[in-house]
């Protein structure tokens, strides 16, 4: 059975973006890029919520024209060629999305996990991650904690989320002090 992997960047004060929604603070050094690329390579489908999707589709289709960062140059072609699913009740169709899930999220994700293939990779976004956590559908949590205090922004998980015990599966320090920790569903 395929796994659903959650891969997210957060600040040490637990925010996934800054007070004004900025996402200019993650430090994608060589080691962290390699970690991210390994997660992508074991996945054959990327999953996004609407908010993260809007940021991804605004950058990655033409990323090489906007940045010459090694991570960007390696990830952009992979992003373009990998099937993408967007969970949204407000988006009906998008040229870059393979599929849009508007209703029956639990049923559709459960069905995807049962299908043959590589893993599903959920990147960022607290709303969709919170809902999929509540539904018990996320198998692995990969959390990159960056050495920055943002002082506000969206929390890693929505306020009021149910308590959930996880099993520690490993941790490592990458590049300039980014700590990546993996937890598995207990």
Locations of regions flagged by a protein language model:
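Enzymes that bind and transform nitrogen-containing heteroaromatic metabolites
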Residues: 1-186
């Amino acid at each position: 059975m395929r796994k659903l992997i959650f891969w997210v960047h957060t600040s040490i004060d637990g925010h996934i973006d800054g007070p004004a929604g900025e996402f200019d603070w993650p430090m994608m050094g060589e080691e962290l890029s390699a970690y991210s690329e390994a997660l992508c390579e074991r996945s054959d489908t990327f999953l996004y919520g609407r908010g993260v999707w809007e940021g991804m589709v605004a950058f990655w289709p033409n990323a090489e024209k906007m940045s010459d960062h090694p991570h960007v140059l390696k990830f952009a072609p992979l992003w373009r060629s990998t099937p993408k699913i967007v969970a949204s009740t407000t988006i009906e169709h998008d040229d870059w999305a393979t599929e849009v899930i508007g209703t029956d999220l639990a049923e559709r994700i459960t069905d995807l996990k049962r299908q043959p293939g590589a893993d599903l990779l959920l990147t960022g976004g607290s709303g969709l991650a919170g809902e999929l956590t509540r539904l018990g559908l996320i198998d692995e949590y990969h959390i990159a904690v960056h050495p920055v205090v943002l002082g506000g922004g969206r929390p890693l998980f929505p306020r009021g989320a149910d308590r959930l015990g996880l099993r520690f599966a490993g941790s490592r320090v990458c590049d300039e002090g980014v700590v990546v920790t993996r937890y598995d569903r207990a």
